[in-house]
Amino acid sequence: LARLIDPEEFGVVAIATVIISFFSIFSDLGIAPAIIQNKHLTEDKLNDIFSFTLWTGIGISILFFLSSWPISLFYKQSSLLSICHLLSFNLFFASVNIVPNALLFKDKEFKFIAYRSLFVQCIGGIIAILAAISGAGLYALIINPIFSSILIFIISIRKKPQKLKYTFGSKSIHEIFSYSAYQFM
């Protein structure tokens, strides 16, 4: 990719990556380690936590999406606007993948996680290279993270299915936050 894309375009994507990393911290909130450590989580509680991460992911993605205008104005890079808009999908899928991924780690399915990651990164890398060859420019750099987060979620949710609740029990969230708050800080 380095031979196909200008260094300036790498810089623009690097700016967006640093900013999205900040938003990602708030989407996780230490929930994954709390799920791994807690031995008393029922399926119902896990569904509550999954629903919470979904709604949190929607909120943080919208916040990042709306922040893209001030970000692009601050850095005087109009291309940052569309990059941030597209990367907001990455934030959402990373957030909703917290519970299924934590359950995979909790169940010590490391081989599955490794194969899943290898498969997704190879496919995403090939797609990114093909996009760069076809002239996608800096968009070729964000295809892989977006594609990867979506595909990892699809694979993980099929392996560890969760049910969406439109409301979630505050007791379940409070129970998990008693541990995750320390992880977050």
What residue spans do the PLM features occupy?
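Hydrophobic/aromatic residues in alpha-helical transmembrane segments
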Residues: 1, 28-32, 67, 100-101, ...
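Primarily residues marking transmembrane-helix entry/exit sites
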Residues: 10, 45-46, 80, 138, ...
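Membrane-water interface segments that mark the loop-to-transmembrane alpha-helix transition
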Residues: 12, 16, 25-69, 82-88, ...
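Interhelical loop/hinge segments that connect adjacent transmembrane helices in multipass membrane
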Residues: 111, 115, 154-185
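Alpha-helical transmembrane segments of multi-pass membrane proteins
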Residues: 22-26, 62-66, 77-103, 114-122, ...
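Membrane-interface helix-loop junctions in multi-pass transport and translocation proteins
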Residues: 2-17, 69-73, 81-85, 108-111, ...
